[in-house]
A protein has these predicted regions:
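Short catalytic/metal-binding and nucleic-acid-binding patches
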Residues: 1-177
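Glycine-biased, small-residue-rich flexible motifs in mid-sequence functional cores and linkers
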Residues: 168-340
Length: 340
């Protein structure tokens, strides 16, 4: 670990498929998952002040192998690591060009972990899939990833304490529309509701004025519904969340596909995670059929026609598969949910 600020490479055109790319200086987040997601590496617990992972002998072997890896590869620095019950993370910095690629180094590390596990009497496969690599190339990614790795145990503990809040529901029906959802569904039953919708052309003064109105209503008990599409909507929704007020967000995609490997382990990221764990968030992603609903189509057409007339333009229908249609439809669904 290090306290020194490190700037990740910013060349977004760099391709990690180029020969020798994985030997060059870079910063990589690596995730290695235990076979069948078994809790082979430890048990989640709480010491009264924070969530911790009580490591098994195999879990400690993973730590010991990290030290061995650093001895063999002095070009590498571990910026963050976390052993979880069924997986472990490392954020690795390659400080100078190596004779071997970082993939080869990680493969050797995993082989060392397997050997240690066998020495401890564990003869079954330790891993059943290759590690997941994420190269950090954008400014700000490094800090966010280190914080993510550090908070892994706390997030897992919160999910365990509130499992229903992190359970994905594929068929949540509201107002005759079907949604995929996650979070506090009781927010749908709260009678006092407000819609947060702002034009993309709204200036800072308009955003601040609307922010005041939304916060007053939220303080008085209103649940805020929003698609959080425009910058104004995003800013106000973020402030509502930071103040601890409940929020219902309509998503234009975001949940993993039904039946996909990611479905079982999906969880909202970043600040959404904390809001979800405290019962202050509900995420709603409309099913494809919801966008084709006749009442939604009619509402979208009326809204777009009204906006065109305000600009003294003629109105023409837009394709339902376009992002413009979907964005307006999300706001109309939000309006329908608020006004029901």
């Amino acid at each position: 670990m290090t306290d020194k600020t490190i700037d990740p490479p910013l060349n977004e055109t760099f391709t990690w498929l180029q020969p020798g790319a994985w030997r060059n200086p870079c910063i990589v987040h690596v995730t290695m998952v235990a076979s069948l997601r078994q809790a082979l590496f430890g048990q989640l617990a709480h010491n009264g002040s924070e969530a911790i992972v009580e490591k098994t002998p195999i879990g400690w072997a993973l730590i010991n192998q990290e030290r061995r890896m650093l001895e063999l590869c002095p070009e590498i620095k571990i910026l963050a690591d976390k052993v979880m019950p069924d997986h472990h993370h490392m954020v690795l910095q390659v400080q100078r060009t190596m004779p071997r690629s970082i993939r080869e180094v990680v493969r050797g590390y995993m082989q060392g972990c397997k050997s240690e596990a066998r020495r401890l009497g564990f003869t079954a496969p330790l891993y059943d899939a290759p590690p997941f690599y994420r190269v950090l190339t954008h400014k700000g990614q490094l800090h966010a990833m280190i914080e993510y790795v550090k908070a892994n145990a706390e997030r897992a503990w919160q999910r365990r304490q509130n499992p229903e809040l992190f359970r994905m529901h594929r068929k949540t029906g509201v107002c005759g529309l079907q949604f995929t959802s996650m979070g506090n569904h009781f927010l749908l039953d709260w009678p006092d509701r407000q819609l947060l919708e702002m034009s993309r052309s709204s200036g800072e003064a308009q955003i601040q004025e609307r922010l005041k109105e939304v916060l007053v209503a939220a303080h008085n008990g209103a649940v805020t519904y929003t698609a959080a599409i425009s910058k104004g909507e995003q800013k106000i929704a973020r402030t509502v969340r930071e103040h601890g007020f409940p929020l219902v967000v309509l998503l234009n995609g975001g949940f993993p596909a039904e039946g996909s490997p990611q479905e079982r382990f999906y969880k909202p990221g970043g600040t959404y995670f904390e809001a979800c764990s405290k019962g202050r968030l509900l995420l709603l992603e409309p099913a494809g059929q919801a966008f084709l609903d006749t009442s939604i189509q009619k509402a979208v057409a009326e809204t777009l026609r009204r906006k065109a007339e305000a600009r003294h333009c003629s109105y023409t229908d837009i394709p339902m598969e376009s992002q413009r249609y979907r964005f307006v439809a999300l706001n109309e669904m939000g309006r329908m949910l608020v006004e029901r």
